[in-house]
Amino acid sequence: MRAADETTLFRTALVLVLVYLILIKFPSYLTIIIFAIALILDAFDGYFAVWQISKHKVGIARYMKATVLNDKKAHEEIMEYKHKVSETARFGPRIDIAGDRVAEYSMWVVFTYLHIIPLIILLLIIVRHSFADAMMGAKGTSSKMKSPFTRAIYSSNTSRAAINALKFITFAYLILVYVNSYPILIGYVLVGALFTFIMLRGAAEIYESAKSQ
């Protein structure tokens, strides 16, 4: 098994442990640290995939230069390696996406179960991901956004960093709401912002898929 897939499976297991810790009201600061580690590992499985396919030629500094600093030359090199991963890896990027979905659904489900997030939000998130993933998977365009809007809202490094940061802030705060009785109103604002961003990204995916037909 590839190191990237092992990392994905590990962070998936870590998220399930995280759900249990939330439910038993484990100390919030430790729970939030574990949540942060799970999110950080999401970046590392992508790196490990590139690291292996490049035969260890791409170091972490080069990868960060491409994905964080948006260096054009480094980005083109990394994208070429990622394309090779999609062609040669047994599961390609699909197992990484599955890990992302398990992690995200787990957070939405646990806070819906705790009556912090309305059920309708969870249902709409499931519908959005199900249809967007199906359409993008059929067309294989998830990393090939063509219009400036869809690139900006979905595939740009800025957009990806923003959605991950918002997920962390939102769910970390909801942990504080449940464990430490923080004010729920701020949590609702964060959930609304995250939900809106996710729906916009879903619209970008569906729009790009429809255009490619």
What kind of feature is each model-predicted range?
Residues 1-9, 15, 30-35, 140-213:
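C-terminal membrane-associated helical module and adjoining short loops/tails
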Residues 6-94, 108, 117-125, 183-197:
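Membrane-embedded alpha-helical segments that form the functional core of polytopic membrane enzymes
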Residues 14, 45, 99, 103, ...:
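Short active-site segment of divalent metal-dependent hydrolases/proteases
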Residues 16-22, 102-115, 170-178:
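Membrane-interfacial alpha-helical segments at the cytosolic side of multi-pass membrane proteins
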Residues 21-24, 48, 52-55, 113-116, ...:
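Juxtamembrane transmembrane-helix termini
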Residues 103, 122-130:
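Hydrophobic alpha-helical segments of small multi-pass membrane proteins
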Residues 128-144:
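Membrane-water interface of transmembrane alpha-helices
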